[in-house]
């Protein structure tokens, strides 16, 4: 296969190598799936010696196909039969449906194993449409019934998104979209199918709409009831994971958070005046035993969906960019709680920062955050039996760790938003 994958992949939203210089992009394995559809595992190497593997499905056509879209065109290949056009096959509804049929019939093709979960039905005849919502993966929606998520960057080992969704589904927890199937090689997971949450709304969109209403009207939109229900949902998922996979005791991850603080302070010099106090807060917890179990790992308002019936937690892959073994390591459920609390602050203050808000707007944003934090924690406590704020110093440390990460990110990519985590850091260390 002689396609210039490197020229195409660097422009994809899911490409993770933007901070590195690409050296090569070569197919490591190609599996023909029929009807001009090839499955490609692409090895990408960088000039600093780092390597990673991506998954691409290639649809070959004898002529340009405008309906796939310009971004789907990978390149062309010339041979005895003339020029062929290579497209990202997930933009071809027929190719996406071919994948779903392979999963439905639990077939094996070459090194690829497709598996349907027991006692489920896949909508193999439903129309397929690629979703534009995701960044690190690509999803295809089949009617109103199922969603196929194709992992773009693939890593050897057990994928936590499939693993935890399977555990939760088999335990009967209703707070996740039911796992319907998956596909993999002998060494790594490649994709999964879940029930599609039709007529759902993302938590981030709902929260920011509430804040917008608050700033536009004296009464404002109240999100507190939804926050309470979300707290109940998160606690329910935590309880199921703890019951199904067990709990243990570990020390607070002092080395990890201190390493992150050092790296973040280099990226965001604004952190330097606060670094000693942040480090002091972390060191207070050194050797502190905490209860841990498997958790979501990267929970925020963009990872939850509100259906007409309830809240659902999605995307259990863990924190992007972290090694797979770290993403599968048991952690305190307070990490997930801290992620939601940080997300409340972002929902409220991003409109203050981007809209040039005054002190009154900031005060109202703080009031909105406090009200929703109270509601979320009350909902969590109603299921878990204890308010997460009862472990206030540990929860604050996880919030600080998250805010430190956010400060580094904003300093690199979105400097105008840096005041959001800096405001929180100042509050948490005061």
UniProtKB/Swiss-Prot annotation:
<dbReference type="GO" id="GO:0005992">
    <property type="term" value="P:trehalose biosynthetic process"/>
</dbReference>
<dbReference type="InterPro" id="IPR040999">
    <property type="entry name" value="Mak_N_cap"/>
</dbReference>
<keyword id="KW-0320">Glycogen biosynthesis</keyword>
<dbReference type="GO" id="GO:0005978">
    <property type="term" value="P:glycogen biosynthetic process"/>
</dbReference>
<comment type="subunit">
    <text>Monomer.</text>
</comment>
<comment type="similarity">
    <text>Belongs to the aminoglycoside phosphotransferase family.</text>
</comment>
<keyword id="KW-0418">Kinase</keyword>
<dbReference type="GO" id="GO:0016301">
    <property type="term" value="F:kinase activity"/>
</dbReference>
<keyword id="KW-0547">Nucleotide-binding</keyword>
<keyword id="KW-0067">ATP-binding</keyword>
<comment type="function">
    <text>Catalyzes the ATP-dependent phosphorylation of maltose to maltose 1-phosphate. Is involved in a branched alpha-glucan biosynthetic pathway from trehalose, together with TreS, GlgE and GlgB.</text>
</comment>
<keyword id="KW-0808">Transferase</keyword>
<dbReference type="GO" id="GO:0046835">
    <property type="term" value="P:carbohydrate phosphorylation"/>
</dbReference>
<dbReference type="Pfam" id="PF18085">
    <property type="entry name" value="Mak_N_cap"/>
</dbReference>
<comment type="pathway">
    <text>Glycan biosynthesis; glycogen biosynthesis.</text>
</comment>
<keyword id="KW-0119">Carbohydrate metabolism</keyword>
<protein>
    <recommendedName>
        <fullName>Maltokinase</fullName>
        <ecNumber>2.7.1.175</ecNumber>
    </recommendedName>
</protein>
<dbReference type="InterPro" id="IPR011009">
    <property type="entry name" value="Kinase-like_dom_sf"/>
</dbReference>
<dbReference type="GO" id="GO:0005524">
    <property type="term" value="F:ATP binding"/>
</dbReference>
<keyword id="KW-0321">Glycogen metabolism</keyword>
